[in-house]
Amino acid sequence: MPSLKTKGAAGKFASLLLVLALSACSRPAPPPETSGELRVGTRNSPATFYIGHDGETAGFEHDLILAFSRAQNWTLSWTEKSRPQALFDMLERREIHLAAAALPQAVVKDRHLISGPILFETPVHVVYRTADRAPRGVAGLAGKKLAFIIGSGHGPMLMRLKRKHPELSWAAVENVWPEELLAQLQAGKYDAVIINGMDFDAMRNFYPGLAVAFDLPYKQKIVWALSPGSSHAFRNALARFVERARSDGTIKRALERYFGHVKRLGSSDILGILQRRPQRLPDLREHFQEAQTLSGIDWRLLAAIGYQESQWNRLATSPTGVRGVMMLTGETADRMGVSDRLNARESILGGARYLALLKDALPARIAEPDRTWLALAAYNQGQGHLEDARRIAQARGGDPNSWADVKEALPYLSRGSYAKVMKYGYARGGEALRFAENIRNYYDILLRLEPEYDPLINLGRGEDGLPPPG
């Protein structure tokens, strides 16, 4: 998941200010049905709304709100607040039409606001440091420093649990984001924290020392909160949109985009890339950046592929004969003009050319980011086997242009259940799935830790990123 603190060019920053400009006017917002403008309050969160590495707004709820506003032909304005209470106040003053901030339905109803349709349900985790002994059940939290965020909806459940476990105690903290709460847990301020799965899943790759001990015996229903003055026409339009988004796969694809890959890596995998990054990546960074210039593919994605393939080992060789940083086969190396697969620069440029070729070979109607994830599967098992998986996805009633549907079809390549639609025969489809999903995770980590590369901005700079003296 991209960092919440993304540096961009001046133009991107200006756009961000426009998108997140706080309303200076406290007058009630006119209904979107008459004004043609949908005003939404949100919070900056990797699960909800953030600025991506390309300077564009993104996030699970962001994508759904954007689709809703487009379906109604309304313009869209965002107001960002750091606390749910501030969003609730704006709703009560009718300054915004709805709030989208991973809000539990129970919290919305407790505030006597209008709950939109349920978007999805998320488990509630008890998260601890893996260096400590994992608490076993609620009884194991006795005597522990436990914390949760005020307004998260966890208080009522804890009060009910305390009736059976009177020794249970906790700190209810405010003015922090879930990411900050996890950082405090990792730093030792608390022994365990309560956080919903939506928030933890979005950040688990950045806290390899934390893990889920167990889930509390309830799930949270995530909804959008509507202003008390919302018209029936607005509520009905929202209900129809959510119903359609659930049936046509829009919600499924959004969940896949932001959360579908985040549980693939184990703690050792995350620690591995964090430890090897300062040791091995510096010698390869300029080659990955050159490959970006030639292919147009983000160098951090190419570096993620290189890590998945060889852990950035330029001399890597497998028993099957694939070699080098990008672990190219002899045939692929010949096609891409690579004469020495153990030459790091040649291997990286060859891998970038190959991925660009695979992306270009896909039908033009396939949009990003699905286009890239599908190309990664083809990078691992070949274009022909990817096309078989797309045919299987379609035969199963899915969308062959959606990674969310094709990823479910990939394992069938090794089962033969759909042999009649498989032109290219058996393949290790599950391996292609793991390959693509691992790379997505490594890419998320590198997006957070490594700056973007702009060849024009970096023109004339040295290896340290600084301009020449004088």
Swiss-Prot record:
Keywords: Cell outer membrane, Cell wall biogenesis/degradation, Lyase, Membrane, Signal. One of its GO terms (biological process) is cell wall macromolecule catabolic process. It is an enzyme of class 4 (lyase). Residues 263-470 are annotated as: LT domain. It is a peripheral membrane protein. It catalyses: Exolytic cleavage of the (1->4)-beta-glycosidic linkage between N-acetylmuramic acid (MurNAc) and N-acetylglucosamine (GlcNAc) residues in peptidoglycan, from either the reducing or the non-reducing ends of the peptidoglycan chains, with concomitant formation of a 1,6-anhydrobond in the MurNAc residue. Residues 1-24 form the signal peptide. It comes from the Bacteria. GO terms for cellular component: cell outer membrane. Residues 25-262 are annotated as: Non-LT domain. GO terms for molecular function: peptidoglycan lytic transglycosylase activity. In the N-terminal section; belongs to the bacterial solute-binding protein 3 family. In the C-terminal section; belongs to the transglycosylase Slt family. NCBIfam families: PRK10859.1. HAMAP family: MltF (MF_02016). This is Membrane-bound lytic murein transglycosylase F. The gene is mltF.
